[in-house]
Swiss-Prot record:
Residues 178-205 have a biased composition (Basic residues). This is External core antigen. Residues 25-27 are annotated as: HBEAG. It is found in: Secreted; Host nucleus. Belongs to the orthohepadnavirus precore antigen family. May regulate immune response to the intracellular capsid in acting as a T-cell tolerogen, by having an immunoregulatory effect which prevents destruction of infected cells by cytotoxic T-cells. This immune regulation may predispose to chronicity during perinatal infections and prevent severe liver injury during adult infections. It comes from Gorilla hepatitis B virus (isolate Cameroon/gor97). It holds the Pfam family Hep_core_N. The record marks 183-184 as: Cleavage. The keyword Acetylation does not apply. The gene is C. GO terms for cellular component: extracellular region; host cell; host cell cytoplasm; host cell nucleus; T=4 icosahedral viral capsid.
């Protein structure tokens, strides 16, 4: 919590730890979920185990390889691009802060505690954010949401009643446990045949080329 208070001191311009605690109370009173505007929730992401998410380094390399031009562009590409930019910048600032704290702590045990806290707690949140937005850009938001729902249903189903393998994002919708209901195409109901009039009519002569 000391590191978190230090973050709040910097971000909230609070000069003391006591002031940062007030800022912390204000933040905890707000219901902010970074996934809400994208149709997901923190709880939905929490169904995925922590070892599911690649390392931050791998995720950053993936984002750079696939979307570097768009991320560095001054143009607004999509909400996912914007959120991905913010997550990358946040991780960079967090690494800078953690390095500064580690270099200024004389106690080796305290330095180790700071590193473990950043990697275990904050690192997991950043990995979740990076994975979510990279996946949305790669596979589409609807596919990612369908995957999260399917995985959540799969992981909460007793092993005896669920498929042996978890859903795989890259193979949806084939491996989806629950599929979203889509609009089924309208079926045209056959119209009742009209009765032909009993009066004789002259039939049109059809050429062979006009027949289907």
């Amino acid at each position: 919590m000391q590191l978190f208070h230090l973050c709040l001191i910097i971000s909230c311009s609070c000069p003391t730890v006591q002031a940062s605690k007030l800022c912390l109370g204000w933040l905890l009173g707000m219901d902010i979920d970074p996934y809400k505007e994208f149709g997901a929730t923190v709880e939905l992401l929490s169904f995925l185990p922590s070892d599911f998410f690649p390392s931050v380094r791998d995720l950053l390399d993936t984002a750079s390889a696939l979307y570097r031009e768009a991320l560095e562009s001054p143009e607004h590409c999509s909400p996912n691009h914007t959120a991905l930019r913010q997550a990358i910048l946040c991780w960079g600032e967090l690494m800078t802060l953690a390095s500064w704290v580690g270099n200024n702590l004389e106690d080796p045990a305290s330095r180790e505690q700071v590193v473990n806290y950043v990697n275990t707690n904050m690192g997991l949140k950043i990995r979740q954010l990076l994975w979510f937005h990279i996946s949305c850009l790669t596979f589409g938001r609807e596919t990612v949401l369908e995957y999260l729902v399917s995985f959540g249903v799969w992981i909460r189903t007793p092993p005896a009643y669920r498929p042996p393998n978890a859903p795989i994002l890259s193979t949806l919708p084939e491996t989806a446990v629950v599929r979203r209901r889509g609009r089924s195409p309208r079926r045209r109901t056959p119209s009742p045949r009209r009765r032909r009039s009993q009066s004789p009519r002259r039939r049109r002569s059809q050429s062979p080329a006009s027949q289907c």
